[in-house]
Each structure stands twice: as structure tokens, then as C-alpha cells.
Amino acid sequence: MTLAEKILSQKAGRKVEPGEFLLLEPDIALANDITAPLAIKKFKEYGGKKVKYPDRVVLVPDHFTPNKDIKSAMQVKMMREFAREQGIEKFFEIGRMGIEHVLLPEEGIVKSGDLVVGADSHTCTYGALGAFATGVGSTDIAGFYLIGKVWFRVPESIKVTLRGKFKDLVTAKDLVLKLISILGVDGANYKAIEFSGPGVKEISMDGRFTISNMAIEAGGKTGLFPVDEITIAYERERGIEVEEMYPDEDAKYVREVEMDLSELEPQVAYPFLPSNAKDVSEAEKERIKIDQAVIGSCTNGRIEDLRLAAQILKGRTVSPDVRCIIIPGSQKVYKQALKEGLIDIFIDAGCAVSTPTCGPCLGGHMGVLAEGEVAISTTNRNFVGRMGHPNSKVFLASPAVAAASAIKGYIADPRKL
């Protein structure tokens, strides 16, 4: 069996097959300040009085928080009141929250082998832990509140075999952008993307979260890593004991892709699709002027990402024509960055440092683009109008490329600084 089949079989209590429909009880049901209010309204419309499993419900206000306007304040107020009313303890108030997909693994809320649903498409991030995690609609979450179950179709799987080691300043973000360019934005529709091979051990947990996070950008249902010694060490730091989990040798896949980490260059995904990836050495030749650089998000807002950005920015200055916004993914990441002196490096370089928020990624706040403006961002989507005005543009890249570009004022190769 594949990893996806193993986890779903364990939850179903029997062996399952791709294409089969299941009604299962997830371990965690997540929603945020955009998706939770609709789930709450629907729960009440369905006649709900008491949430079936309040201990499995997680509510994280992160998209428009700290509240950017009255409407967003009302959204979070609804979440807050629902949590109190239902005895939901895992409501993360502003000041204690983080970007949801950074926060939940960090807090040990999601663990290896879990079945997780979230009313957010990047819930697939937790596949890095060897959890079957996938995005669902707010009405699915409402259904979970009511009966404690959600329907699933067992996905087919794509196997991605990794070999070699990353070269200097090449990262997990570059790997996943390259993979999406190979698969296409719909190449993994309703399939699990499973990572294997000796190269897996070269990727840290922070890097694995980045890769699994963007599985959805190829249409993937989830992006799964095996549970190995790296996963076990991460979980043990949080007081969680898990066992190794690998796919069976005779597991069946609908497609197989091989990638050599040592052959990768830093990547840049051009507008308006995450699959439009090019080598940064080629992009640099075009001298694409930028107005803004964003380093953060559920894709690249972890401590390793900030360390990499600081490595590039230390002793240098952001171009006077560029706004560089740094967003730690959680309060713990922020505190660690403070402890390591990274925040000083960012401020000395001329960056703005924000409290944890999804803000600019979805064009919500904290970095909305004006007409004609261009951004390079460590986020995960660059669709038309994604970060602001419909006539703005977003290029996706790693923290190293984003930081180098902020310094140069145009999309630049960090290896040449």
C-alpha cells in the first residue's frame, strides 16, 4: 500500500483501495477567520446545538488578523464566541496564534498518522509529518461539527523519488516549484503526491512542510513524506512518540517522477501560475524590476526560512525602490528570530517586520499591491490579482531569491551576491 492507503486503511479499520468512498472520523478539523464563520452558520442552519467533538476542532484567525477592518473583526468575534459557547479550547487568540499551517505542527496538534481536514486548501502541509491532511469546504467542516465525520475518496498516488543533495542556496521551495512545473497545475488532481528515495533524508522538517504545502498547486489531494528518523525527532521534541511508516515495496502508483537535488537551481515561478518556473539565472538576465518582496507565509515563514533570508540580508540594504516585508509564521518563530538576532538584521537592512499573519499572500492586508506593481514572494500562489490589483504581478521564489531581489531591486540570483 501507498502511504495514503495505509493511513486511510488504519482509520477505516480495513484495507482500502483507490477510488473507494469512505465516511471517516478525522482527528482534527481546522478552520480560519475566512472559512470558520460560514461553517458556524451552516452548523446552526443544519440544526446543530452541540459540536460532536470539540476537542478535535481547531480555530485559527490568521488571514485578516490582526483585524484589518470592521468586517474582519466581526468574523473573528463569531469564531471567538463559538469557541466559548462550544467549549472549544483550541481557539488561538491574536497574540498567541500563528499562521495555521505553521502553528499546528509546532504545537503538536497534528501528528504522524493523523487524518486531518481543514477549510483551507493548504491543509496538505501536514503530509510532511506523514499525516493524511487535505483541504475541504466550510460545509464539510460544518458537517464534522454536527456528526464528527467527513467523506473521502481514496486517492491514487504519484511517487516522486528524490536523490542527491541540494547545492548551496538551493532549497525545498526550488524543488517543489520545479516539481509543479513538471506535473502542471492539474497534473496531480485528486492524487496524493508521495516523496521517497535517499534524497528525502536531505530535507529538514521545515523543508518538508514547504514541499507538502504546495502539493495542492499541482492539484494534489495531499503531499506525503514517510515517517522517518527526522519526523520522529521532530515529534519527540513535542512529547509525541510515533513509529516509522513507509509505503510497501509493492505499492502501486499512477505515475513516477525522479528528481536529482544536486541538479536543481534556484527557481522563480512567473505569473500567473505556480507551474511557470524558470531557473533564476535565466530570470536575472531579464532584470525584472520589483516593487515589493514578501518573505513569510505558510510556505516559507519558519525559522529556517528566516535564517536563510537573514544570511542574504546581513550587512546589506534593501533597494530604496523596494518594500521588503518579513512575516514570521508564528509567535515562537518570531521569538526564536529575536533570540538569534535575525530581526535586527532585517530592520537594519530596511525591512518591515510583521506579527504573524497570512495578510499579503491573499491580497488581504500588510502588503497589498497597487496597479502595475510587481512582487517577488515566498508564498504559494501567483494567480491574477492574488496579492492585490488585477494588473499587479507576483513571482514566486525561495527566501534566498526574494532577499537577493529585495537588495538588487530586480529578480536576482542570490549566488551572485
Curated annotation (Swiss-Prot):
InterPro entries: Acnase/IPM_dHydase_lsu_aba_1/3, Acoase/IPM_deHydtase_lsu_aba, Aconitase_4Fe-4S_BS, Aconitase_4Fe-4S_dom, HAcnase/IPMdehydase_lsu_prok, Homoacnase/IPMdehydase_lsu, IPM_dehydratase_rel_enz, IPMI_cat
Record EC number: 4.2.1.33
The protein's annotated pathway: Amino-acid biosynthesis; L-leucine biosynthesis; L-leucine from 3-methyl-2-oxobutanoate: step 2/4
GO molecular function per UniProt: 3-isopropylmalate dehydratase activity; 4 iron, 4 sulfur cluster binding; metal ion binding
Enzyme class, UniProt record, top EC level: lyase
One GO term (biological process): L-leucine biosynthetic process
Matching Gene3D superfamilies: Aconitase, domain 3
UniProt organism field: Thermotoga maritima (strain ATCC 43589 / DSM 3109 / JCM 10099 / NBRC 100826 / MSB8)
Family membership: Belongs to the aconitase/IPM isomerase family. LeuC type 2 subfamily.
Positions with a binding annotation for [4Fe-4S] cluster: C298, C358, C361
Role, per record: Catalyzes the isomerization between 2-isopropylmalate and 3-isopropylmalate, via the formation of 2-isopropylmaleate.
Entry keyword annotation includes Zinc: no
Cofactor comment text: Binds 1 [4Fe-4S] cluster per subunit.
Keywords, in A-Z order: 4Fe-4S, Amino-acid biosynthesis, Branched-chain amino acid biosynthesis, Iron, Iron-sulfur, Leucine biosynthesis, Lyase, Metal-binding
Record field: catalytic activity: (2R,3S)-3-isopropylmalate = (2S)-2-isopropylmalate
Cofactor: [4Fe-4S] cluster
Domain of life: Bacteria
Pfam families registered for this protein in UniProt: Aconitase
Subunit structure: Heterodimer of LeuC and LeuD.
Full protein name: 3-isopropylmalate dehydratase large subunit 2
